[in-house]
Design a protein with these regions (language model features):
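A conserved nucleotide-sugar
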Residues: 1-41, 154
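Aromatic "clamp/platform" in nucleotide-sugar-dependent glycosyltransferases that forms part
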Residues: 44, 63
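A short hydrophobic beta-strand element within the catalytic core of glycosyltransferases
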Residues: 58-59
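An anion/phosphate-binding loop that grips the pyrophosphate of nucleotide cofactors and donors
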Residues: 55
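Short hydrophobic beta-strand element within catalytic cores of glycosyltransferases
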Residues: 80-84
């Protein structure tokens, strides 16, 4: 997908966060596609709120995510967010979220990314709080979730 976007907009840069099991495979693919100068492997960081300020569009074409906190955080920072339709609709709290099927041709994903050029960013923290994504509510949600997981392990 990034290769298609980059061919339309050569000044684009892809920031990849995390160090999961696909890290090496993705690095190899980036080299194979000759995109090393345009892809940055950021690893893991506890500075994501600062990182969101360097991003123009948050894209998560994921097969399986559960409730991705990163998608909620990206909205709070005012970013437009494009998510795979496999991701729970609970994440789409603000009007700056677009869901796309993974089966869609990458051309549709690229078109949607480009549609967000010139997007006016502003903090959406209040919208998220009204939707139940206050820090305390989210902490309580995850606490209950992990307590249930632990209970099921017994």
């Amino acid at each position: 997908m990034f290769s298609a976007l980059h061919s339309k907009c050569p000044d684009t840069v892809l920031l990849l966060f995390g160090d999961g099991e696909l890290y090496k495979k993705i690095q190899d693919k980036v080299k194979k596609m000759n995109l090393e100068d345009s892809v940055r492997f950021m690893g893991t960081t506890d500075e994501m709120p600062k990182m969101y300020q360097a991003i123009d569009v948050f894209v998560m074409p994921s097969f399986c995510e559960g409730l991705p906190v990163a998608g909620v955080e990206a909205q709070a920072s005012g970013l437009p967010v494009i998510l795979a339709d496999t991701i729970t609709k609970e994440v789409g709290v603000t009007n700056c979220v677009k869901y796309l099927p993974l089966s869609d041709d990458k051309v549709e994903w690229v078109r949607e990314i480009l549609n967000f050029r010139g997007f006016k960013r502003y903090s959406r923290c209040e919208e998220l709080k009204r939707a139940g994504f206050d820090e305390k509510d989210v902490a309580r949600y995850f606490q209950n979730y992990y307590l249930k997981v632990l209970e099921n392990l017994k």
